[in-house]
């Protein structure tokens, strides 16, 4: 065997393995591992690939429903939408690389999630993202926003998939660890889904796509450790993406799938060739022999260690039907991509890697994954925070000035500056563009549409992880409902700090319990996801951020609702109960200067009952516009509806039973705003009363201003100018 470094405790630690984990390796293989084997174990046993801190808790998630074709465990989740069609989708993080090298980190995050989708045999039709940045005044924030947004747009636009929605937030807790969560959605034939499990002995294992370089080595390990002041030095571990190569890879993969060449397929993502080969073999209960001399490389003198751990982008591994090998090769050559037989399946259940005639690794394949450490880490529940009583909160300004301030804050202002850099209409199927509750994308040339959203409220999750987890799912369910969609399933991206700290693990466990309970109550299963831990720098963790990506179905996309008021003279109805909950509200934080209190409680039965009623109104054509209530509460939602349409509203005063600023800006859950024609208002209100659904008329659309009885009014154009100005001004250098 070639000269390799001697295995020392320092080398083991540098690979992110704890002493007890290394002892486990020694016991498992009965000898000291080679350097290449140490790298393989480091890749397969890190947090990013093994889920060793989270797996025990993830098992409790509801993952089944009659429409679920494939739940967690594959490259992406798959749901049946009827007519022989399936939706394939997943969300993943690229947090650590995006902080170090924002443009490349974001591009490869998009590229990786697109590969997860088309690996399953689906053509990508939409992307979304959830972005969390540090405080605007932090010296790195502008640079990170600029790089990440350019990277997402650069990759998606070049690849040719629309970016149709997302979330962006700013908070000082993300100063040292931004979050870049990318979601991709694709369409496939329900009976032509491709999986990762290899089958058959002595089947050719084929390397496809771009050449292997030294970029991304230990990328997965970097994503499994917290940052410190030396993190900038990790720039070489950030992968480099090429969207044009990925587009060629997509077309070549779909073509050989259509030609019935494929037994199994796995994209080379985290841990590259190592993870893809091990997963294919282990899932098929087979061994894998690899000959690295056959791997196409773009750099000279690459070692076995480097080739096995490279995370170069735009690469796939396939097990092909032997009789189809020549046909498959011709297809890939036509698209100008590398095609190389790099190994074979074996009955040995061992993972054997050869290079230059030497055996560089010989390991039990199933144990690489199945025997990874599994931790039930100590966790403590977050302390309960006191309920903030609205009558004890002094209003620092009048209602309309408070609204003007809120809509120009970093979290509530328009994100047009971001989404206008994304091509959100390419492919020609985008029905509802960014800026509303959920994006709506047409399903091919038929009448169906998909409702797509990404949601989470991290400040709620910090204050009460259980309620915050429930609320993230409930808001995704509401956003899909508000456009007329029937919520079908979610993908989650669970972003947390260091799980070795009991309080952080407590946040994770609490959020997961809330997510599980909400998914069960709303019949909204989890079909795919990703866990990103160690999101902290120098011991300062991010806010717990379990991003929820939701997918819903519209049988007729023309019967969707938008947030824009449709006409003047229509009745504005508030559906759901309003108590004026100010705890953890944006108003309390950004107007009153208090980030405190318990978040609003989530009533899942009310969410289901009220959401079903609103969806029925949209389908019946009764509702002319609809909007769910979330950040900023009632008046911010009304302002958004007015700004989207250019039509004002005349609003009744707050009821005497609720403090005015709590009524207008409280963030009670399970609420919607709906407009109906004046001729329908009485009938709808009577029907709601009969059904026991809280529903109140709060005003009438019309005019050019938002006017509250007994308060000042403000022109909609004035609001829109403030709403649209903050982000472009900030990115242009304004304080």
UniProtKB/Swiss-Prot annotation:
The role this protein plays is: Part of the phosphoribosylformylglycinamidine synthase complex involved in the purines biosynthetic pathway. Catalyzes the ATP-dependent conversion of formylglycinamide ribonucleotide (FGAR) and glutamine to yield formylglycinamidine ribonucleotide (FGAM) and glutamate. The FGAM synthase complex is composed of three subunits. PurQ produces an ammonia molecule by converting glutamine to glutamate. PurL transfers the ammonia molecule to FGAR to form FGAM in an ATP-dependent manner.
* Highest taxon, organism lineage: Bacteria
* Gene Ontology biological process terms from the UniProt entry: 'de novo' IMP biosynthetic process
Q: Which residues bind Mg(2+) 2?
A: 116, 267
What subunit structure does UniProt give?
Monomer. Part of the FGAM synthase complex composed of 1 PurL, 1 PurQ and 2 PurS subunits.
Sorted keywords for this record are: ATP-binding, Cytoplasm, Ligase, Magnesium, Metal-binding, Nucleotide-binding, Purine biosynthesis
The active site of this protein is located at: 48, 94
UniProt keyword ATP-binding, yes or no: yes
What is the name of the protein in this document?
Phosphoribosylformylglycinamidine synthase subunit PurL
Name its species: Bradyrhizobium sp. (strain BTAi1 / ATCC BAA-1182)
Residues engaged in binding Mg(2+) 1: 92, 530
Subcellular location per the Swiss-Prot or TrEMBL entry: Cytoplasm
E.C. number: 6.3.5.3
What NCBIfam families does its record include?
FGAM_synth_II, PRK01213.1
Task: Give the CDD domains listed for this entry.
Answer: PurL_repeat1, PurL_repeat2
Q: Which residues bind substrate?
A: 93-96, 115, 239, 311-313, 532
User: Among the entry's GO cellular component annotations, what is one?
Assistant: cytoplasm
Which gene is the coding source of this polypeptide chain? purL
Which coarse location class applies to the principal site listed for this UniProt protein?
cytoplasm
Q: Which family does it belong to?
A: Belongs to the FGAMS family.
> Quick one: which pathway?
Purine metabolism; IMP biosynthesis via de novo pathway; 5-amino-1-(5-phospho-D-ribosyl)imidazole from N(2)-formyl-N(1)-(5-phospho-D-ribosyl)glycinamide: step 1/2
